[in-house]
Amino acid sequence: MAKKTHKMGVAAGIVVIVAVVIFVRMMINVKTYRYSTVDTVLRNPLIGFAPNADYFDAVGDNTLVYVDVTWRELEPEEGVFDFASIEEENFLDTWRASGKNVVFRFVCDEPSDEEHMDIPDWLYEKTDDGIFYDTDYGKGYSPDYSNETFIAYHAKAVEELGKRYGGDSFFCYIELGSVGHWGEWHVKYEDGIKRLPSEDTLRKYVEPYISAFPNAKLLMRRPFSYVSEYDLGVFNDMTGHARDTMEWLSWIEEGGIYSEPEQPMELIAVPKVWESAPVGGEFTSEYSMEEMLTDRLDGTLKLLSKSHMTFAGPMCPIADEDEKDYPDEVYQVLKRLGYRYGISECVMTDIKLTGQLSVRLTVNNYGTAPIYFDWHMFVYLMDGSGNAIKRYDTGVDLTEICGQESADVKLNITGDDRKHLLNGTYSLAVGIENPDTGMPQVQLDMNAENMDGYFFLN
């Protein structure tokens, strides 16, 4: 009798367990969606190639353009800033209207084949203590960067640039710029050009940019102390040149001493600079673009990956030539420039007892660097016509998801929104919005139906 009672108890227990399982399954419904990556070029904002803005046909589908301006072009007469000519020559109204952004560099000395000055005549007359040079770099005029009059007028010029272009993120990356040949913070002192001044004096060329461009990310050619002090990025104008790039990477990873100024300056080790500030630059002119995209492609790709670069220009493959001739090679390069976000998994858990639909997304960055601007990822309720009815901020900080990293985000949907999703009236989509437009503008690396930046999850 005891055995029979025991068996009946066990059976009853099993019935209860089965009933609970059935009840839970009826009350909780879980759907999992997975998305593979896509093997295609993604022309996303704020990353990629930055061809010269004044070469219209070179730009194509690229989202960045490069503009450099000499002081002579900017301020031909004291206090008179010729923005109109700069904007016309570089098609800035066109690029702004088409949603592109600018990589900018202000230059005081750009060597060329002819004798010339890149500072205005009026400033030369007020200072007149630089030197005209003729070296294997070319010909030009190197100002005395320790001249306090020159420094004061430089601060005013950068201030005016900021008033014109620093109010939004159209000018998104500012390369400093200002000092040395091509704005690269070096001069050919061995040919008689006066060395750069001390670190404290050179600081006066950095500080005006900090206040003038609060919405942009600033970059320097070398990791001087200002890089860590002001959270600046870095740029390499010898990308693709193995020896020079490895030397540049050694500065980033280990620091060192920069002996060119009149007083040697310390280079600060910033091995993780790319995690919080952009790395840019351009391809070396030592080799042809054809050579870098063919015989030297493997080495170039490895250097790009090690550098965690976000953009390259103006020396870069251009749309109407290189991109047409070497599409596969260009794609390999672009894959190694900047972010490449995508959703790999979406889990929707509906709990009937609580009336709550939980959505968990796994956000991946398949690229080599994060985005450096405060762009938000949203989940959208989409109606049958493809209109976004409502949006939910996922709260994920995309700037913290570095290259080859991922993060899970969760959100809960209740009420009528949940009902419309469950009965199929609405569907879910995900997108990354440009805060300037309030619209999703990032192509995600995920194999999912998409429309105008909305990527459907179910």
Describe the residue ranges of each PLM region.
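N-terminal Sec-pathway targeting helices
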Residues: 2-17
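Hydrophobic alpha-helical membrane-insertion segments, chiefly the h-region
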Residues: 17-27
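Catalytic-core regions of glycoside hydrolase
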Residues: 33-54, 96, 173-182, 188-318
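Conserved, mostly hydrophobic/aromatic
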Residues: 65, 161, 174, 209, ...
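Extracellular/luminal regions of secreted and cell-surface proteins that mediate adhesion/ECM remodeling
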Residues: 333-458
